[in-house]
From Swiss-Prot:
Transmembrane stretches, start-end: none
GO molecular function: methenyltetrahydrofolate cyclohydrolase activity; methylenetetrahydrofolate dehydrogenase (NADP+) activity
Protein's recorded name: Bifunctional protein FolD
InterPro entries assigned: Aminoacid_DH-like_N_sf, NAD(P)-bd_dom_sf, THF_DH/CycHdrlase, THF_DH/CycHdrlase_cat_dom, THF_DH/CycHdrlase_CS, THF_DH/CycHdrlase_NAD-bd_dom
Chain positions recorded as NADP(+) binding sites: 166-168, 232
Pathway(s) served: One-carbon metabolism; tetrahydrofolate interconversion
Recorded catalytic activity of this chain's protein: (6R)-5,10-methylene-5,6,7,8-tetrahydrofolate + NADP(+) = (6R)-5,10-methenyltetrahydrofolate + NADPH; (6R)-5,10-methenyltetrahydrofolate + H2O = (6R)-10-formyltetrahydrofolate + H(+)
Cross-referenced PROSITE patterns: THF_DHG_CYH_1, THF_DHG_CYH_2
Stored Pfam families: THF_DHG_CYH, THF_DHG_CYH_C
Name of the encoding gene: folD
GO BP, one annotated term: tetrahydrofolate interconversion
UniProt record similarity statement: Belongs to the tetrahydrofolate dehydrogenase/cyclohydrolase family.
Amino acid sequence: MPAIIIDGNKIAKKIELKILKKVKQRKKNGERIPGLAMILVGNHIPSQIYVNKKKISCKNVGFFSECWNLPSNINEKEILNIISKLNENKNIDGILIQLPLPPQINHMKILSSIVPDKDVDGFHPYNTGSLCQRTPKLRACTPKGIITMLKYNKIKTHGLHAVMVGASNIVGRPMSLELLLAGCTTTVTHRFTKNLKDHVQNADLLIVAVGKANFLKGSWIKTGSIVIDVGINRLKNGKVVGDVEFKTAYLRASYITPVPGGVGPMTVATLLQNTLEACENHDDI
């Protein structure tokens, strides 16, 4: 039997409607609306597209947003000065650094300069460490969004053998911590992993984030497994595909995310959730 498609667009819209309702209530109560500042360095076209999507999403849920478009030859000190001002700005609840940054910029130094309670991307060492200690604060958007997708589909994760293919700081590593928190027995594979196929075939829950089109063969997937494809890859013919060979995987999995329309919308929706959460936390200070 073909897999059930996990519709990220549908879930993201439900989340955004809930956020909009809360923002309207805040305005009705005379409270401040959430504010998000985005920093974009250089002319990286995909990054510009992502930032524009986030600006539109902020507008749709009633947030205030601003974007700092900075030249690619900017130095670290200038970016740090901007972040310092945003850290002190009481109208800004979240600060987002659109990655990647130019090679002359130390991205960890930049990310670590954001105060943790405004780190709505969840990349600050404090927030990563809090997740590791099982006391999550602001959590990385894509991994948190994936957990939300599973919950919306009433997929029970406790006791599942989860295999994370990819070990990036943005997805793979924080996702492995989320999976542990969700009660999974978790395996993380990476570019040095031997016999990847063997690991994949043993996965009850498979999450793939390597950034290579159709990298993982659908025939490797265990019948009845849950497949989450994080990859977004554009082929020469313009078609957008994931990291998993979808047609074959669809016939073997019990649940699967499409590309596009799966994980992507959830990442943005989770960013909005984090920004609202940060705003509410700032109210309590």
